[in-house]
Swiss-Prot record:
Lipid bilayer topology: Multi-pass membrane protein
Keywords: Cell membrane, Glycoprotein, Membrane, Transmembrane, Transmembrane helix
Top-rank lineage group of the source organism: Eukaryota
TM spans (from-to): 10-29, 51-71, 87-107, 132-152
Chain ranges on the Extracellular side, renumbered to this chain: 30-50, 108-131
Name of the protein described by the UniProt record: CASP-like protein 2D1
Keyword Oxidoreductase assigned: no
Glycosylation sites: N34
Native source organism of the sequence: Ricinus communis
Cell membrane among keywords: yes
Signal peptide (UniProt feature, chain positions): none
Amino acid sequence: MAPLLKLLDSSLRVSVIPLSAATIWLTVTNHQDNSSYGNLKYSNIMGLKYMVCISAICASYAFVAAVSIWIKCLVNKVWLFFVSDQIIAYLMVTSVAAAMEILYIAYNGDQKVTWSEACTSYGKFCNGMKTALILHALTLCFFIVLAVISAYRAFSMYQPPVSSKETVEGDAT
């Protein structure tokens, strides 16, 4: 792998770790008590527990992958990185979507199922969730770039396919 690409790959993987840790910390410590409606915390909402779980998986994988890039025997396992990066990126997409939907409903409610918006009563909680979602979305962007890098590394090992025109010209000679 080119040194610049390896440095970018490592930097992104290392950057994902504190972003994921911050997402987890902001989500887990986020709670607000309301005298009318009671205490709201992340563990009351399944989608936020999912986001915390995916963030923990993401940070753990990023750490292992960042270390593995510098170990010679694992550098040649480009397909392992490619598949793993794709899986993590897709898991991140699902958790960002779930958290975004929760935040949307918290701000706007859903009149059809008689859910009222909650952010007027739990403004601090909603602001904390918004910050956590922004960090989680940034982590997703990093993993999309990592997925592209690992795809490039995996598929650049092969020659491009020969076009039918080149095949016909080769047969004529």
